[in-house]
Every structure is written in C-alpha cells, then in structure tokens.
Amino acid sequence: MTLLGMTSVVAAQERVVELTNPEESCTSIAAGRKATVDGSVITSATCDGTSRTWMEMVPAQDWPDTAKVDIYWDIRHTESKNDRLGVILKGSVPQVAHTHAFLSTGYPCMNEKQLAMGETTIVGRKELVNPKGMFHIEDLQALALQRCSTAREAVQLMGALAEKYGYCDGGECLTVADKHELWFFEITGAGPDDPSALWVAQRIPDDHVTVSANTPRISTVDFDDRERFLTSTGLREKARRLGYWDGKEPFKFWKVINGAENKPYTIRDFFVLNTMAPSLKLTMDMDELPLSVKPDRPVALTDVTRLLRETYEGTEYDMTKDMMVTETLKDENGAERDTTYKSPLAQNWMTKDMLNFLNAQRPQDKPIQKQRTISVVWCAYSFVAQCRDWLPDAVGGVCWWSEDNPGESPRVPLFAGQTDVPESFKVCGHKHYRPDAALWTYRRTNRLAQVSWGHGRQLIEPAVLSFEQKGADELPLVEQKAVALLKEGKEQEAKAYLTRYSFDFIYATLRCWQEMEAELWHKFGRGF
C-alpha cells in the first residue's frame, strides 16, 4: 500500500497557531501486553479542554487513483460533522487505494485494525512552531488510522508526512498501541525556517507502563537501536544547528524540544508511575523520571480507569485534607460533644475563584496548594482503549468512552467493529448549552453533584462503579456472541450486534444520569 503521496496543494490562508495551555491539556496512561492482567495492550487519554465531543464512525472505503484528501484546520472545534464555521482548507495530499474504518473524535483514537492512540499536548519551545506547515496532530492521527494496521507503521507514517508536508502544531505526544506493541511518539515543529518536524518514537517494553502529562518525556535516544527508536531525518544535525544540543552530551530529546531548565515530568507523571511501581521509591525531587516502569503487579483495566478518576484524595497532595469543620452535637443522653469531619462542600475540582476565596480565609502561611489533578471538570472526553490479539479485530478493539469529568462520568464501550453511534454523540456541547448533546446529560448531573460533593458523590460514585462492573460482567458474553457470528462468516451481523449493544449501554447511562439529576434537585431543592 502507498502510504505517502508525492504532491500537496496548500491554501493561501494561514492562521496563527496558538499553543495549548497545559492546564487545559491531557493525560495519557498506557501499558504493554505483558504488563496487563489479560495481555491486552492499553492506551488512554483525557481530552481536557474544548475539543469537539461529536464523533463519527468513518467507514472503510476504496478510492480512485486521482483521489485527494483535503486537510482542514480547526475541525477539532466544530459543533457537528457538517459545521464548517471558522474551518480553513489548508491543503490536500493524495489519497491511498483503501482506507480503514476508524472512530473520528477530537483526537481520532481507534481503527478497525485495533490500532489506537492516546494524545497529550506537550507544548515545547514556542520558536519551533511554524504555521506554514500543513498538519496538526489530529490530522496525522486520522491519516494514520485510515492507512495503518500497526503502531510502528503509524509512527513512521505520521513522522514522514509531517516532514514532507510540514507540521504546524505545538509539541504533541501520542501513545500508540496495537495488538502487540506500544510506542511513545513525541513531535514538534522544526522552527520558522523549516516547516518540517522534529520527532522521536520510542518503543515501550512489553512489561512496562508509561504516562504522558503535558511535558516532553523522551530522554536519551539510541540512534543505533532501530528496534526501539525511530527518529526524524537529520535530527541531531538540526538540533545542533538550532543550538539545542552541543554534540557532546547524551542526546536527550526532552531537552532539545523543551529546554534543560524545564523539568521533564509533572505531578501527574509522578503520581501514575509511583502508583504503578511504589517499590521504585520515585520522588518529585528527581531530575528525571523513567519514561516507563515495570509495575509491581499486573495492571487491570480498572487500574487505568481509577487513575483517570484520580484527584489525589487521601494523599499528601489532597487539596481538601484540611477542609474540616467542627460541629457541636448532642448524643442520645443530651450531652454535647464536638464532632470534626470533612465539610461536604469540600472537593478537589475547585475553580480558581473558589480556591482564592478559601485561601483568603486561611492563615497566609498555610494556603491550599493548587494541584493539577488527573480528573478535571473541564475534560471534554476521555477513553481507555484495549487492543487484544486473541479476539477478532471487530470485537478485540474496544474504547471505554466517557464524556465530561472522568471522576464523575460512566464509561461506555465503543467497538472497533461498531458502525454507528447514537445521535447525541454526534453533536458537541461546547459552543453553547445543547440538551441534545450527550455531554450535557452527564455534565448537568455532575456539576450539580459537585455543589455539595460530600452528598452528591453518594449517588455518582456508586453509579460509575456499577456501569464499570456491568461492562466487566457482560463483555465476555458479548465477545462470545460476536466471535461466533464472525466464525460463521456473518461479519455484518456481528457488527450490527456490537453496535446495538453499545447503543443499549450508552442509553442506560444517559437514563441513569437523568434520573440522578432529578434526585439531586429533590435533595438540594431547599438549599445545598
């Protein structure tokens, strides 16, 4: 198959590329097949910001030799598939003969071959951004998912396309998984005089887990080990010419694209790695953290979903640990007794205004220290993708999808062989309030529960875990039925069955969150 075209057409229009605020960025956790309980390769992402929540199951397709692929800027912030307000045609590249079906999301995440990608923005040096380049990271993801079957193919293609046609985005990281391998891909622009790209992909050991949380992480690159490292053309020479590497010290990619003065990890990187491998005794004082670690015990799907819900509650980084109140109560004998407990208003998703208000009431030498939690209320969507080589692709690949705050919303299965999604998943709720968008069904209930989280969580958390258990209980039976249909040669029936199951699961969560919203209004009707 031809993966790269030979020509492109670039529109005259250009737009200033704005670097993402890391506070409104993403977290990706991934695990190799020998690091997981069941042998699946896992990747994940929280899309924290205003990227579109509308999605589309794009079907596989054959194309004529003359076909082109138009590349548009800013589809990631549209309201639906047909919304073209503010969208700019940047250029086009030749199409290939056949494209795979894939799940088109804000950052496209899985195809029919069980190739999956988690994304995080890593920003990097501002001076490396070149708006003359053609591709944003989501464009490269879409093309790779349509054209590739393996993670190695995908990183090679994305790197080659970015070098050939230009990369206009800020620094980005993709955790790219297939049924067998996991790759960590970091890319940035090549500077104002070169619309190309600087990139490195490092293979994660099969028995390791890794994390990316908005800062470059790839350290020393072994240019002689092509099994573990793939790089852009002339990377060392370009880094030296730009003054980012002296040619003598070890070539650390994070230093090249982010500067030695910036730490190559965040609290989220540390928290995930330390949770997975506490025996390593990692600390936040280290100059670097390992890119990946061997977990102390095999990682389950629920370990990853639990980490995506994480607010550090119960740890030294818990922002609510001192939010205690004392109330004088009478016991059964009428004796008064002081009782101290955490305020039901305490929660780790405080706005800046709330945090400032609370700190104004506290001693100046004991402020609440703001922490960037993994779970945030400004999350657009999140997912955990499983790639499983012992199952046919249609059912082996599954994205456990969630909209709004991953600490409050349920996860629903979207299969690699699925052919459609509900209508409420086809519209985005970011530009204005849309009751027909699934995002707002979850968001209304979640925000209401947060007002008095000590009470609201008593509804939300059991519901989240209930649907997680529902998936664990039902998926083996679903897989068995789908595999049986596929063995009988009934591919379309199998895909229709998976699609119906996904729809039913989604509808059950939507109904549950609507019912909980009503219950919360009843509970808080006379005050929070």
Which role fits each region the language model picked out?
Residues 1-7:
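Bacterial N-terminal signal peptides
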Residues 346-483:
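Substrate-recognition/cap regions that form aromatic- and gly/pro-loop-enriched pockets
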Residues 147-153:
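Short, charged, surface-exposed loops that flank catalytic or proteolytic processing sites
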Residues 141-147:
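Short, well-ordered beta-strand elements within core beta-sheets of diverse protein domains
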Residues 240-390, 394, 398:
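Glycine-rich, aromatic-lined ligand/substrate-binding cores of catalytic
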